[in-house]
Each structure stands twice: as C-alpha cells, then as structure tokens.
C-alpha cells in the first residue's frame, strides 16, 4: 500500500459518506431524497433515477417525470414502499412530491444517524491508517527514519479526511437546524 493508494481509499470513504448523507431529508426538496428508491417496472427492479428525471420545482417540491408514462403508478408505489415519509401525487404523466418540514423528533433522529455515520467514516479512515502503518513496520526495505516520515504523512492525511467528514456533518446538522 502506497501513500497515494491510502489517500485514494480515504477519499473513497469521504465520497461514500457524502452519498450516504445526501439522502437525509432536511426539509428542502432535493433529488437525492428519492433517486435511489427502487421501483418494480418491466419485470425487474430499477432505481428511480434510471427510469425518470427528478427535478426540484420549488424549495419544498420535487417533480418526477418518467421516461415512460406507463411507469407513473409503479413510481408512486415505489416511493410509498420506501418509507421516506413522502406522499407522491400523480398528476397525469408526472409525479409530484411535497417535501414536508421535518418534525423535531425526525431532526433529532437524523442528527443521531448523521453522528453515527460520521463516526463510522472516521473509524474507516483510521483503519486505513492502521493498515498502512502495519505494512510499513513489516517492510524491511525501509529505514526507521523513512518509516517515521511516512507515518507522519499518513497521520496528516488521516487528520485532513477526518476534519472534512466533521465539517460535512456540521454543515448537514446546520441545514437540519435552520429549516
């Protein structure tokens, strides 16, 4: 494992954390709320983003325009089945979703999930650091000074990525508090 590969793995953890938390409902309409919803169409299960365009019509409303108008009812059922606390409204060949303002209880629950997920991401980053350091110590070709230098660099990377995760979590928490 090289320093560059460790950094790439850490960046992957950060990206995964961003994707996981993007779907948290903050009270503002955002396509990420429903794009991963699975829908039963054409005899198979597909992601909503693969069968429809999802747009924001205003701050609290999503507009879903299926590529095939025959999938409207399946999309509505898929959204209801996803238990997102969202009520789809079928309007001809489109589905409209009014995003309700989150309740205080919901906000507390999402903040708990957010903190748990951010801690899991930081643990994953620290595990990458530990694996890197373990491999360094087993490498007989490196001098003690080289090992110390690389350990310092991997620690700097770890701190950088953990800080980015904390900042993203704080931003998301602030979004939840201001809506």
Swiss-Prot record:
Gene3D superfamilies: 3.30.1360.40, Ribosome-recycling factor (1.10.132.20). GO terms for biological process: translational termination. SUPFAM superfamilies: Ribosome recycling factor, RRF. Disulfide bonds: none annotated. Transmembrane segments: none annotated. One of its GO terms (molecular function) is ribosomal large subunit binding. GO terms for cellular component: cytoplasm. Belongs to the RRF family. NCBIfam families: frr (TIGR00496). HAMAP family: RRF (MF_00040). This is Ribosome-recycling factor. It comes from Chlamydia trachomatis serovar L2 (strain ATCC VR-902B / DSM 19102 / 434/Bu). The gene is frr.
